[in-house]
Amino acid sequence: MSGRFVRASKYRHIFGQTCKKELCYDNIKLSNNAWDSNLLSVNPFYLSVNWNAGAGGALAVIPLNERGKLPDQVNLFRGHTAAVLDTDWNPFHDQVLASGGDDSKIMIWKVPEDYTVMEPYEDVHPIAELKGHSRKVGLVQYHPTAANVLASSSADNTIKLWDCEKGVAHVSLKMDVMCQSMSFNADGTRLVTTSRDKKVRVWDPRTDKPVSVGNGHAGAKNPRVVWLGSLDRFATTGFSKMSDRQIALWDPTNLSEPIGGFTTLDTGSGILMPFWDDGTKVIYLAGKGDGNIRYYEYENDVFHYLSEFKSVDPQRGIAFLPKRGVNVSENEVMRAYKSVNDSIIEPISFIVPRRSESFQSDIYPPAPSGKPSLTAEEWASGKDAQPDLLDMSTLYESKGTVEKAVSATVPSAGAQVQKHNEEKVETPKPEAQPVSKPKESAEEQKPSKEPEVKPTTPSASKVEEPSKKRDEDNHQKEETVTQPKREKTPVEKSFPKPASSPVTFSEDVKKEPSEEKKLEVSDEAPKAAPLAESKKVEEKEPFYVSKDKKDISAVNLADLNKRFEGFEKRYEEELAIRDWKIAQLEDKLAKLTEAIKEKCN
């Protein structure tokens, strides 16, 4: 009997599932910088995007639950004076983010509480700045077990290990050329790098000399590297001399050659970005410039091909969600966020189809919990520890509710940084003082105190125009006018501001209080934003007013969120039905296969 044997694997049927367009993130302005990075970074709550901000550098942070089309102008995280090249979320604090830029600076950011991109908000400034590199910082990556320890790679041919809380670099690893990719192992005791000299180096992060060095891919394009989590192995992707795309598996104790040699995959031209799932022992390879994502299962020092997610939409940036953020109830083992045409970010769920609706413990081993095992001082003193792990069944019992990781302290590195931030915040204060006078006078003229405006009909709204100076005797006239159409007059909308920021939207119009005042709306009139008469306001129309001048209120946003939740619920129900049908078809196919084999025998 001759037959074909299929390797048994519980991940053999993993498939990638996209979502509908209305559940994607639209109106994205992805950075067009030529530096080779992933451009995106994600944690269970936020998605960071290297933004095309024109002059200077900026990044955008999008809450994952705010899907749909973003406003034309969004709130940005500004502080870099050149393009942002790479970002990484703190694994122990879901609101803290690090970024490296073309200006040789490293910025630490904190996402404000109740942050949103759907409503106007002041640009966010860094809470700390790490200075030490002399050229652009192309890579930043947090330590997997020690809180507030950050690795950064620069074009000055150094890799620095920072204590973000103190703002000092404990170690500086010197290289002959620039590092192009780096990755920690699971406990952070080893760091592997690839570089322009086509060498692969394994480092002890506390020493300034590599533990071992070997020859990597021979091609001219940038190689990538990823450590295989808790395993004593790492993988690289790159190109051969003939520009064939390759993958290689390495033993960090012997870099003379890769295990099994360099494996050729195809002749594609895009760089392969590797992502490792330590729970399933599956590696995902996303090609930059093409729309496909391949995945292989690691077993006995061999990568076994599983399947491929195919798409006609090429990706230039991509990020994978940490394990504690996946949807356990839907048997989702990984989730990717890929850019589409540099204007849309599309979530892709990788699902293991199962018939049972109970928790699938065999595909969800414990995963990193988001709690540090060491402090930065303990790590610097030489201590090591395994990562703190989370029982994934708790996510199933909580119906996918993930708690924010806030174990790490928020860094406030260096007195220079604090002074720098204070100057940015305090300078607008003297300018804002004359603006407060019209507010006080407007409060004195509220209709509740001096009702001078009466509507002619219950449905019509009228407003009272404050008096103006028209001659030297300060002669005043009061007029009652009907509220003009919104097509002619822009609407100014007031939103709550963070208490720490003294800057207000009213600073855009700086005139004497006697020359310009705002109109008041009577109690009987429907709620609307105050009208402004200044020509400057007409020229700089607020970005939250749409072309047809429709009011966007919190109530409307709540309705939209409810509709999105309804769409998601319906999508999940249809997905479950589809998976059930697939499982039935697989059973029928298996039975038919067995019947055919019996007949052949």
Swiss-Prot record:
Chain positions covered by the region annotation Disordered: 361-386, 407-540
Residue ranges of WD repeats: 79-119, 132-172, 174-213, 220-260, 266-306
Residue(s) carrying Phosphoserine: S500, S501, S553
Pfam family, one: WD40_4
GO terms, biological process: actin filament bundle assembly; actin filament organization; actin filament polymerization
Keyword terms, alphabetized: Actin-binding, Coiled coil, Phosphoprotein, Repeat, WD repeat
UniProt keyword annotation of Membrane present: no
Quaternary state and interactors: Binds to F-actin.
Basic and acidic residues biased stretches: 419-429, 437-453, 462-495, 507-526
Family classification: Belongs to the WD repeat coronin family.
Stretches assigned to coiled coil: 556-600
Gene Ontology CC terms: actin cortical patch; cell tip; endocytic vesicle; mating projection actin fusion focus; mitotic actomyosin contractile ring
Any GO MF annotation of the entry: actin filament binding
Protein name stated in the entry: Coronin-like protein crn1
Organism this protein belongs to: Schizosaccharomyces pombe (strain 972 / ATCC 24843)
